[in-house]
Amino acid sequence: MTTSSDNLFCPEQNFYGPASKKIYVDGSLYPLKVGMRKITLSKTYTLQESSFSELPMYDTSGPYSDPSAKIDLQKGLPCIRDTWQTQQKETRPSNQSSHKPLNGRTPIRAAEGGSVTQMHLARKGIVTPEMEYVAIRENQMLEEWIERFSIGGNTFSPVTAEFVRDEVARGRAIIPANINHPELEPMVIGKNFRVKINANIGNSALGSSIQEEVEKAVWACRWGADTVMDLSTGSNIHQTREWILRNAPVPIGTVPIYQALEKVGGVAEELTWEIYRDTLLEQAEQGVDYFTIHSGILKDFLPVAARRMTGIVSRGGSIIAKWCRAHKRENFLYTHFDEICEILRAYDIAISIGDALRPGSIADANDEAQFAELKTLGDLTLKAWEYDVQVMIEGPGHVPLNLVAENMTRQLEYCHEAPFYTLGPLVTDIGAGYDHINSAIGGTLLASLGCAMLCYVTPKEHLGLPGKEDVREGVIVHKLAAHAADLAKGNPTAWLHDNIMSTARYSFAWEDQFNLSLDPVKARKWRKESSPEQGENIEEERFCTMCGPDFCSMKKSQEATE
């Protein structure tokens, strides 16, 4: 294992302070360097006969938090996967488009008729570098703690590369990792792993620039986004995505129908399969790791959706619905699904099968249209698996709290345990300005029941294009939701994080509390603002301004036992 020096890179983004160091954990099967953060604690904490003077943390920031890294956004991040791609021998140069990557690499694809997907290799019994990488990440160097930990009579085992392989082979987990995204630090999405979160970014016809979107993508990674979706619908969609990909250490997803629509001047009726196919190939060669494709909305579902309070709220779904009505034909993303899968398996692109008929209001939740489409998504999942294509299923939406659990039950039944990826769900329709909290409430419950990844919502949801601070708020709130779900599922590393935080709080170890929080910047700032007279001596205070020195329950509790 190698460790970087002091965390000085990008001081304005030095979120975690000098107690946090970037470290790299070596692989045992492959020449891997798996990035994590290590927090040095102010004291040693003893929990279940294990002692901790430092805590390794799961880290999504890539090289951006490494002071030794030489970051040049013009050139992109280092191509770390080039040295360990097992699929290389099964590939050939790709000439499907005129795309020229910023990093100068020649795009590659599977040999004619071949497959290079993680599922294909997993089903052949091969443990790939990506599988070992994500196993190391999930364990956070805490294998000994995981084996000792028990709760409610349940015991646990560390994640192994073989376990990851088996989950991917079964379709219960995916590793989104296009062979043309060599800058990627692989991660896993599945109900038997840490709950992940996705951050949406992207320009619109009314705002933002390439620079702003790249900055938002990096910002989201720094705050903890496990994946990022570029949902650009404005100008320069292709160039924006290229800059994001070359500087992204996390998987990047897109909705290709947006760029296809741009090519026909925004006129949905003029879309064709050929235009869409060419768009898939362009994005595949760029390195997009997963596509949201709305193949499950069928023309027979449209009359049912028309009776809803809020109709079709999916942008991609509304585009396809308009095309189907105009041409009086079936959705071409459904009729050409086999051809789509052939493209996906050639580049190892996962498919997020889109829920075009997700409810956009609680009145429409769990209705006939939503569940009819969900059954179709299950059928498409089986078809994609015939091609060894990795699949996750998109979910709602707006769902009142009492109907949330049914979504998970039906998804597991209809979609054969493929990972569930949901936008919330939002549990009320009146949260404008606070819909990130609204989303996190439903997301926490759904993730505790088995949802694998939560798509964040920002405070600007339903109101406008989010800026950097909105991205930060959305990421932090959904990290909180994901972590709460991990606790409910008994995740040992999540419980350790909470238990050390609680012990630090009881012992008034303020710096440890800041460093262990999801937003150390805000925690440190608000604590110091509440006691400005203490200055740098805040560690000596055994109370906060909420209760003061005479009414602090923890202080009194300690005094009572002395």
UniProtKB/Swiss-Prot annotation:
Q: Where does [4Fe-4S] cluster bind?
A: C544, C547, C552
Q: Which GO terms describe its biological process?
A: thiamine biosynthetic process; thiamine diphosphate biosynthetic process
Protein species of origin = Prosthecochloris aestuarii (strain DSM 271 / SK 413)
Instruction: State how the cofactor is bound.
Output: Binds 1 [4Fe-4S] cluster per subunit. The cluster is coordinated with 3 cysteines and an exchangeable S-adenosyl-L-methionine.
**UniProt KW Glycosyltransferase keyword:** no
- Identify the EC number(s): 4.1.99.17
Question: What biological function has been recorded for the protein in this entry?
Answer: Catalyzes the synthesis of the hydroxymethylpyrimidine phosphate (HMP-P) moiety of thiamine from aminoimidazole ribotide (AIR) in a radical S-adenosyl-L-methionine (SAM)-dependent reaction.
Q: Which InterPro entries would you find in this protein's record?
A: ThiC (IPR037509), ThiC-associated_dom (IPR025747), ThiC/Bza_core_dom (IPR038521), ThiC/BzaA/B (IPR002817)
Indicate whether Iron-sulfur appears among the record's keywords. yes
Report the family membership: Belongs to the ThiC family.
Q: Name any GO cellular component annotation.
A: cytosol
Please list the residue ranges that the record marks as compositionally biased, kind Polar residues: 85-100
Broad EC category: lyase
Superkingdom field: Bacteria
Q: Which UniProt keywords apply?
A: 4Fe-4S, Iron, Iron-sulfur, Lyase, Metal-binding, S-adenosyl-L-methionine, Thiamine biosynthesis, Zinc
Q: Lineage from the top down?
A: Bacteria, Pseudomonadati, Chlorobiota, Chlorobiia, Chlorobiales
| Region named Disordered | 85-105
Q: What is this protein called?
A: Phosphomethylpyrimidine synthase
Name the gene for this chain: thiC
Question: Which positions in this protein are listed as binding Zn(2+)?
Answer: H398, H462
Concerning NCBIfam families, the annotation shows:
PRK09284.1 (NF006763), PRK13352.1 (NF009895), thiC (TIGR00190)
Q: Name one GO molecular function term.
A: 4 iron, 4 sulfur cluster binding
Binding residues for substrate: N200, M229, Y258, H294, S314, R315, G316, D355, A356, L357, R358, E394, Y421
Q: Which pathway is it part of?
A: Cofactor biosynthesis; thiamine diphosphate biosynthesis
Q: Entry's Pfam families?
A: ThiC-associated, ThiC_Rad_SAM
